[in-house]
Each structure stands twice: as C-alpha cells, then as structure tokens.
Design a protein with these regions (language model features):
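Non-catalytic C-terminal accessory region of glycerolipid acyltransferases
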Residues: 1-152
Length: 152
C-alpha cells in the first residue's frame, strides 16, 4: 500500500499462477484487496488497473516471441462493494488482449493453429484464422539468430 500511496506502480499477476494453456484463468482477489486497502488508508488516491496481456509463442523454448499488450486503464470505484465488478472488468479486458481458446475445443483448435503456423501470440490473427479467412501473417524463424535473442 505504501507504494500506491506514493503514486507508485505495482505489477500483479492476477491469475496467481501460470499455465501452458492459452486461456484466461480465474483472477485472484489480491489485486482488488490491494487497491481497496490503499483507498481505505488514503481516500484521495485515484488507483487505476491497467490490464496487461503477456503471450509466448513457445512457452518451453528460448528465443520464442513474446507479445505484451496493454489494455485501457480501469479506474477503481471507491466503493469497496464494487470489488467483484472490478475483477470482472479486468477479466473481460484481458479476454480482449490475449488468445483465449475455449476448453471444449482446446486440443483441436491449438493443433490446427500450430499446424497452419498461425501466430498464436496475436489475438486478431488467431480469430481471423478461426473465422475461416486466410491469414495475413505467419511466424517466421529467425534462422541464425535463434537462441541468441534471449541471451542479449
């Protein structure tokens, strides 16, 4: 709370864990507790939540592509009873930023995307491909630069 009270920024991974699965998991309550805790101690604050989508082309290999997408800032309503609403707003915002493959078709969909070399870090490209339209971008190998990108 001290950082927030001094108009600092705090990075929180609200899902509370990581997974190789390309979908949004339930968000933990920690980020709303921090925001409302800071507001309780310092009511003149105007905290904002900025959704950040982080996606990897290859989770298990070095030198893969990483796409970081920032969403629009979401103001924290001063009323602490709105914490659940804030969580849902952030969850919805994240779904607009990252690839979110439904569980029901996950294995088939992911296999189809990878076999067709669709950039699985690009939400628009994935949605475009899944709509049945031809893709405009494919992931390219970096040739001799491979495995050097992460070591710079």
């Amino acid at each position: 709370n001290q950082v927030l009270q001094q108009n600092g920024s705090v990075l929180i991974f609200a899902e509370g864990n990581h997974s190789l699965v390309r979908n949004i998991r339930p968000l933990s309550k920690g980020f709303t507790r921090m925001a409302y805790g800071a507001l309780a101690e310092c009511p003149e604050l105007n905290p904002m939540v900025i959704p950040v989508g982080i996606q990897y082309s290859a989770h298990k290999r070095s030198a893969g592509m990483v796409r970081i997408t920032l969403g629009k800032s979401i103001p924290v309503d001063p009323d602490p009873t709105q914490a659940l609403k804030l969580t849902k707003q952030v969850e919805q915002a994240l779904k607009t930023l990252v690839v979110d493959i439904p569980d029901a078709t996950y294995p088939e969909t992911l296999t189809n995307l990878l076999e067709n070399q669709v950039d699985v870090t690009n939400k628009q490209e994935v949605e475009h491909f899944l709509s049945g339209k031809p893709t405009t971008y494919q992931v390219k190998s970096f040739g001799s630069l491979r495995n050097k990108l992460m070591k710079i």
